[in-house]
Amino acid sequence: MSSTEVPGEVSTSVSSYFDTILILDFGSQYSHLIARRLREIHVYAELLPCTQKIEALPFKPIGVILSGGPYSVYDDIAPHVDPAVFELGVPVLGICYGMQEIAWLNGRCVEPGIEREYGPATVSMEPEIKTEVFKSFFNSMPKEFEVWMSHGDRLSALPNGYETIGRTKNSPFAVIAHVTKPIIGLQFHPEVTHTPLGLQLIKNFAIEICHAKPNWSMENFVDKEILRIRKMIGPSDHVIGAVSGGVDSTVASKVLKEAIGDRFHAIMVDNGLLRLNEAEIVRETLNKHLGIQLTVVDASEEFIGKLKGVTDPEKKRKIIGNTFIHVFEREAERIVKETNGKVEYLLQGTLYPDVIESISFKGPSQTIKTHHNVGGLLKDMKLKLIEPLRELFKDEVRALGELLGIEHSLVWRHPFPGPGLGIRILGEVNAAQLEIARKADHIFITEIRNHGYYDKISQAFAALLPVKAVGVMGDKRTHEQVIALRAITTSDFMTADWYDGFSIKFLKLVSSRICNEVSGVNRVLYDISSKPPATVEME
């Protein structure tokens, strides 16, 4: 059953309104895909670190999935799940490391494999399955099916109280299940596309075994979210909204506008790190298409002054985040005086991938970098954050934007990071570097639009590298800076591929324009790194 709200309190979790499957993350690169697959079948899922204490959960899940991970369960430093997971009385599905965790906790029957197993394999069903409940798990599945393996350890024996449901050539315990309890383990990864019928298995677990109601949709989400915001804000308080013009802040602003009307104040901080003519474009866009009056606060000198001499990426993000909050607090005080109201909340367009990337715990996962929407904020911040998109993936945000009637060109606009050009200039940020990065980026994006590539790409930008290269212009030797172009395609920004659709003619044109029109640049590179191992942004 779904979690219920405590009378008199305002729920801050989407899980209060939808049947929720909890995913405990052991550090697998595929963990986020589990959540995505569940949401594709309209079942809500939340991902939390494997160290999550069950007694501290703000909701009761209707099922739990233990993800894969890079460690061996028998290592001293291996992470382990809170045993209380198995006392919740809900179905549990262990995937790869998650399955080995189940086996380790029930007999220590995990050992190094004779051979590592990476790649495709064929699972064969056992002819007789004693565990009646798990016949549902293989509903609509053939007796043999292809799966994707990615493991170095194996089960040395069946855990106490379990039986074998499926096996592969190299894995005699590829699928196991408890004889009496709704606990199942898979040695393979059903969440990846390389397991063609994996989505059916996930659906069977969620719908047939956990009995989840498949009612997760943007239509159901937005009405509940607007009501939640109204309860949280009350009848007289005001909210200031951090607006950048990107799809995230635009959709978030529209949600707030729908919830509290003119008590929402959209504010854009011109931190001096914006794209060319960005403030003017965003002001016109919000006024014309959304009916939202935008206040632009020019704090460029304040930001750039504090970034002087700073080259470390994390320090830059922290400085930008802290300064951002200070500026907003000042603006909130102004609005309080003008409206005789009360400003307690700051809107941010934080998305679920932002949250996942920023999770750090004592286990295999490492914080890759402080995300600009959830990190870099002062611990003593006076404003409370309100993040209506916090539980959504990017494709869900776009679907929500279209549902709210936002114009297609706005919904599908490429993202722009909160720290702006500050993290696209590798090294120290100053006026001269900003001029170079801004002009190069403008040329790149303009040509992408002109040549019909824009809607085929998820994000593109030009970055200024902290190196100089020797070149020749006319008959003179030059020693100038280097621009790196980056364009990626992705469905959720958790993983991404570099875009390979540009023609050589197009790249030649962009390179020529940048070298000729941007003073101080004599070399242009194209970044062909995917995520992972790279991140989308360079800092």
From Swiss-Prot:
Cell wall biogenesis/degradation listed as a keyword: no
Main enzyme class: ligase
Active site, UniProt feature: 96 (nucleophile), 189, 191
Keyword set, alphabetical order: ATP-binding, Cytoplasm, Glutamine amidotransferase, GMP biosynthesis, Ligase, Magnesium, Nucleotide-binding, Purine biosynthesis
Protein name as it appears in the record: GMP synthase [glutamine-hydrolyzing]
Binding site for XMP: 317, 475, 531, 537
One matching Pfam family: GMP_synt_C
Residues that coordinate or bind ATP: 244-250
Coiled-coil zones: none
Annotated compartments: Cytoplasm, Cytosol
NCBIfam families for the chain: guaA_Cterm, guaA_Nterm, PRK00074.1
Cofactor(s), names only, from the UniProt record: Mg(2+)
GO MF assignments: ATP binding; GMP synthase (glutamine-hydrolyzing) activity; GMP synthase activity
Primary localization: cytoplasm
Function: Catalyzes the conversion of xanthine monophosphate (XMP) to GMP in the presence of glutamine and ATP through an adenyl-XMP intermediate.
Domain spans labelled GMPS ATP-PPase: 216-413
Assembly: Homodimer.
Domain Glutamine amidotransferase type-1: start-end pairs: 20-215
Enzyme Commission number(s) of this protein: 6.3.5.2
Gene Ontology CC: cytosol
Keyword Magnesium part of the UniProt annotation: yes
Catalysed reactions, semicolon-separated: XMP + L-glutamine + ATP + H2O = GMP + L-glutamate + AMP + diphosphate + 2 H(+)
Pathway assigned to this chain's UniProt record: Purine metabolism; GMP biosynthesis; GMP from XMP (L-Gln route): step 1/1
Entries under InterPro entries matching the protein: Class_I_gatase-like, GATASE, GMP_synth_C, GMP_synth_GATase, GMP_synthase, GMPS_ATP_PPase_dom, Rossmann-like_a/b/a_fold
Organism name: Schizosaccharomyces pombe (strain 972 / ATCC 24843) (Fission yeast)
